[in-house]
Amino acid sequence: MILNDDVKLIPGSKVEAVIKISKEFVKGKYNEILQDYSSRLKIKGFRIGKVPFSIIEGKYSDNIRALTIEKLIHKSLEEFFKSATYKPLGYAVPKILDEKLEIDFNKDFEFTVVYEAYPEFEIPDISNVEVEIPEVTVSDSDVEDELKLLQLENAMVVDDSGDVKVGSIVRVDFVELDDSLSEILTTKRQDFVFTVGESNNYYGFDNDIIGMKKDEEKIIEKNYSADYKFSELANSFKRLKIIIKDIKKRDIPELDDDFAKDIKDSFNTLEELKAHIRENMLRLVKEKRESLKLSKLLSDVSEKLNIEIPSAMFEAELKNVVNEFSTQNKIDLKKLNDSSMGLEGVSDVFKENVLKKLKSKLVFQKIVDNDLTEITDADLEDELVKQAEDTKMRLSEIKKFYQEKNLLGILKDEIKRQKVKDKILKNVKEIKLKEIAFRDFINYKTGE
């Protein structure tokens, strides 16, 4: 079908291709559509399928030619992309540059398409890249801290007949009052639940309600400093009416052998639980160390390269990041857009980081593509066995899932990516920094 294609790279990580289709194929596709029209058209005086082509062409020529061009472009692009050196991104639709395409049965059909592709660049030698990683040890106090967190997670929330204290879980109604002590209805909030002393409530009235009892009402006055955490309230005065509707407390379990058994039947003693916690913490340290090493290496390599990120790829990733931010912080995108920064302002905050992450992703993908490691059936079988063990499923069920969903190819790609990652981590040079605490290490980011 395609006689030839003239391909060239253009700025913006884009590809321009001039595709030429044989006139014989064009004529054949046109006749095919014409025949389809003939088999379906109802024209007075003719049986279906017996309408002369000349009559159909006289009445529907423009439609048939337009549909022929549409089919030619779709079919030829499908064929072109299968063998294209520069694969198109899935983020954007290829654009046909020709403003008006016409069919001339005496000439080959030609059109120009522009599409965004993965950027072209070469990976430099990464054997001498050095990565700085802080030292970390898991101490007994670290284990105790994690145990206390587990203790809090398993606390029961029960009614508290006493007054409000730091740590109380309260349900309140509150509203701003004007100078005449009338309620400003737009500020009214009902059944607001928070933990006293641990919340980030807008008005910051945690300390003002300490000592209050259930069903008690109180009017408080607040003067907010210039550096208050919510700029809308900075340098302002507010009068609030607060009603305590409910008070609860956490019934924290004792740290003993029974607590360990409640966490998991296989634990007989508290010491066994502590050993399990330490093992998990050491695993987290190992995973974090590997993640930091790979992230730092990819970042260092990408900074040395001039990688032109396709605009469609960048916009898609930026949109995902903003949506994730909105979801995590439970902020509706419309409200985000109506905020003082606006949606565009919020997006600007993430742009630099998104750009860096995309460059690192592209560098890693290029390393994977360049790697000659082949994934064998044995590698695939080992991974399926591991997944069956981890999920407590039968191996046959795991295999059936991947086969029915047509995911074995994707799984092979993931296995290769992990093998390449392991190879990189094995060879990277690590420079150890000063020791930091476990929790600080888990929250540590490269460049800190």
Swiss-Prot record:
It is found in: Cytoplasm. GO terms for biological process: cell division; protein folding; protein transport. SUPFAM superfamilies: FKBP-like, Triger factor/SurA peptide-binding domain-like, Trigger factor ribosome-binding domain. One of its GO terms (molecular function) is peptidyl-prolyl cis-trans isomerase activity. Keywords: Cell cycle, Cell division, Chaperone, Cytoplasm, Isomerase, Rotamase. Its main location: cytoplasm. Residues 167-253 form the PPIase FKBP-type domain. InterPro entries: PPIase_dom_sf, Trig_fac, Trigger_fac_C, Trigger_fac_C_sf, Trigger_fac_ribosome-bd_bac, Trigger_fac_ribosome-bd_sf, Trigger_fact/SurA_dom_sf. It catalyses: [protein]-peptidylproline (omega=180) = [protein]-peptidylproline (omega=0). GO terms for cellular component: cytoplasm. It is an enzyme of class 5 (isomerase). Its EC number is 5.2.1.8. Consists of 3 domains; the N-terminus binds the ribosome, the middle domain has PPIase activity, while the C-terminus has intrinsic chaperone activity on its own. Involved in protein export. Acts as a chaperone by maintaining the newly synthesized protein in an open conformation. Functions as a peptidyl-prolyl cis-trans isomerase. NCBIfam families: tig. Belongs to the FKBP-type PPIase family. Tig subfamily. This is Trigger factor. The gene is tig.
